[in-house]
């Protein structure tokens, strides 16, 4: 299963609340980690955004 197409197309839409453009997430979930910013993609346990932006705070 490949929930993100960022690595292939540069854009992706993971679910209804995760939209990516040029591998930047407007909001990210665990299933969309591959296109989160560097601060999120480093999280081994996945990334979860509690707000409307995807930044280092979404790493848990």
UniProtKB/Swiss-Prot annotation:
Class I metallothioneins contain 2 metal-binding domains: four divalent ions are chelated within cluster A of the alpha domain and are coordinated via cysteinyl thiolate bridges to 11 cysteine ligands. Cluster B, the corresponding region within the beta domain, can ligate three divalent ions to 9 cysteines. A divalent metal cation 1 binds at residues 4, 6, 20, 23. SUPFAM superfamilies: Metallothionein. It holds the Pfam family Metallothio. The gene is mt. It comes from the Eukaryota. Residues 1-28 are annotated as: Beta. Keywords: Metal-binding, Metal-thiolate cluster. A divalent metal cation 2 binds at residues 6, 12, 14, 25. A divalent metal cation 7 binds at residues 49, 54, 58-59. A divalent metal cation 3 binds at residues 14, 18, 23, 28. The keyword Amino-acid biosynthesis does not apply. Metallothioneins have a high content of cysteine residues that bind various heavy metals. Belongs to the metallothionein superfamily. Type 1 family. A divalent metal cation 5 binds at residues 33, 35-36, 49. This is Metallothionein. A divalent metal cation 6 binds at residues 36, 40, 43, 59. GO terms for molecular function: metal ion binding. InterPro entries: Metalthion_dom_sf, Metalthion_dom_sf_vert, Metalthion_vert, Metalthion_vert_metal_BS. A divalent metal cation 4 binds at residues 32-33, 43, 47. The keyword Oxidoreductase does not apply. Residues 29-60 are annotated as: Alpha.
